[in-house]
Amino acid sequence: KPWQKGYYELPLQKPADGVTPAGEPFAYHANDMSVGDIDNDGEYEYFVKWDPDNSHDVSIKGYTGRCFIDCYKLDGTLVWRLDMGQNIRAGAHYTQFMVYDFNGDGRAEMAVKTAPGTVMTRFAPDGTVLSRRYITMPQKDLDAGYSHADNYVCTAQDYRLHMAEVFRRWHTHPEVVNGRWPATVEQCFGLAPQYAYPLCEADALALADYFLDVYAPSRSPKNELRKFEGFVYDGPEYLTMFGGDGAELDTIDYPYPRVDDGLLWGDYAMPRIEPCNRVDRFNAGVAYLDGERPYLIACRGYYTRATLAAYDFFENRFHKVWGIDSGFVPMANPFNDSGCHLAVGTDPVYGILAGQGNHSISTADIDGDGCMEIVYGAAAIDHDGSLLYSKYGTLPDGRTRAKFGHGDAMHVADIDPDSPGLEIFNVYEEGERAPYGWALRDAETGDVRFGEYAEEDLGRCMIGKIDPNTRGLQVWVKDVYDVNGRTLELPTPGTNMKIYWAGDLSTQITDGADYLYGNQYGVINDLTHGVMLQPAGTATNNGTKGNPCLVADVLGDFREELLVRTADDTAIRIYTTTNLTPHKLFTLMHDVQYRCGVAWQNNCYNQPCYPSFYYAGDMDFANVLPQLNAKPTLWMAGDSIMQSYAPGDKPVTGWGEMLHTLAQGDAVCCAAHRADCPFPQEMRYELPGLVIDNCAMAGRSSKTFREEGRLDDIAAHIRPGDLLVVSFGHNDANRAKAERYVPADAFGESLRPFWDAARSHGAVCIFASPVAMREFDEAGVCHPSFAAYREAMRAFAAEVGAPFIDLGAA
């Protein structure tokens, strides 16, 4: 049905206004969004986070209203509403909701951080309530007396008493006991000894008052900690997976608990004392860590301590695959150590990860192994949880080595189409204490291609195809550069959010000229086309960041839709481009890197998502899906029964040279030896939609085939989307020839290199059992041969999850 206007409006049900404990009224605005098909009907549902207008950054004091997440059908039917509860503060850094089909059932789930008080309400299509249910708290927490009625949101008086309790227990703190922190609170504040330890309640309160009224303001006049209220620094924290229908599937403890109110995290160490700041910085993402299935990534911390955990949810239960913890950054004085952002954590392996993260993450296959990695700002985590790199550089003095450090914006994409792999464009916040203010880096190694030192915090950057006359994407902060670092004489576009809108595969920006005047309502423009959309009557989010609710290719023509809230928050407007295009390309949501990016776009400082391929007017479409633009090759590794034979050897024939007749019937087949193959018996069969490359050789076992370099030859040519059929056993079983012999109990391991060669190149390995030796019984029934080798192959195939063909089966 054609749209009546230039947009579609998805009706919303706005939560009721509220009042904080301080008597401050607040109202709600539709904020971040995500999409997922919750019922497998082929149509996305729309997930909307509601933020109160008093939602806060983690560094800002004050109460907030509750946060809600709704799930809507496209017609506006409310499927469910998740009330995050009283113990989840509202703000960009607290609630990252990952919408994806995590269990592979064809329906999207949602993973999100929860707490006591989080409650789900599910609705019937007519709006009546089907159920209202709190999340399931672990039995250990119920036994400890926690309940959904608990409220851990602090008042100013609560915080005063909390600090008194911290001081009263000072002598028992592990850092004090181990001699790493001053033995007394007075020493931390630079005071002469005044009190006996352990402190009594009165002395602890006296020190708390001194801290609030004297010490903290002396560090910075902005440290008005008598007004510290609205934060949560106590109580359980959970990670919950909800089904698309709103049913709770599993709840576990959130990985890496807060431990304290930020004291160990460095929240009291800087001149600006900001309790509950660094400790409550969360990120989340989705990554195909094994190249085949989606995993949830849950993160906490990036200014100092950095932690990440990876979970699979394949069996409707969280299963932790790996965890990473930099450890806390050591401080000589937790109340005065401004170098904590620059130091490393205590973990001997992951310590250098500390302080390197951003306000978002990216997930992409940056090393070309078919598995996705996590780009954590200036660091990268390999798919197996190992640290790929954490980047350091040299300051302008030429001597001092420093970490790249935290940054606010990052883009991971194929920026330079003439350089293999992906690139990263990043800004960095540490100013004069960091080697770069911005840099373009190689994604696989993290090495800088070009960049500049900057003494100030650079908060934004962007990439995109904005100059049709320059090869590659362009990158910009203050100036615009090409992929080689050459400054282009172009006006600098906005840096809030990119969008693919035009029909010429160029890049547009959603803030543009209107952002410069402070009236943010999602204007789309670029340097070539000018203003392309003015969505009047709408509003963007997150203050000066001017974020739409979502930018994603939700309708499926390889351009992106702009999803923004109406100014009165009664609807989400979905704008789609009507610009004609001569290009054909699949929906971007079918590119795994892009689809995962749509899931993590709602992280903190919303960042654009990019496909895994170079997206621009000068793109080579053959590089988009190379496995679909080239014929797959079926490689064959085996012995005499599979081998191709020369005309002089006839009538001897191996089944490998006859396979093409079964693969594509009477199709014309061109058979020839591959020119670069060093083995003369190899034969290549070219069919209209398939190539069969038969590398089998008589007299070879799985062992000698490898030792002669025949598998190496296959590995040098096999590509993603190819197949490798492996069939050995006859010669492996020949005890009389030791050079060939492989015992049956070692046969599986002898096959493993074949599996590894295929798997590492994105190909599929298929195992076929030894062919029977024409041994018939009196009834004329052929008996399978080499049973032990057949079963060993079957077992190995089952172990690695490879297809197995029993050639001896009836």
Tell me the role of every PLM-derived stretch.
Residues 95-96, 698-714:
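Charged, often glycine-rich, active-site loop that binds/positions anionic groups
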Residues 53-54, 87, 116-118, 640-644, ...:
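Solvent-exposed loop/turn segments at secondary-structure junctions
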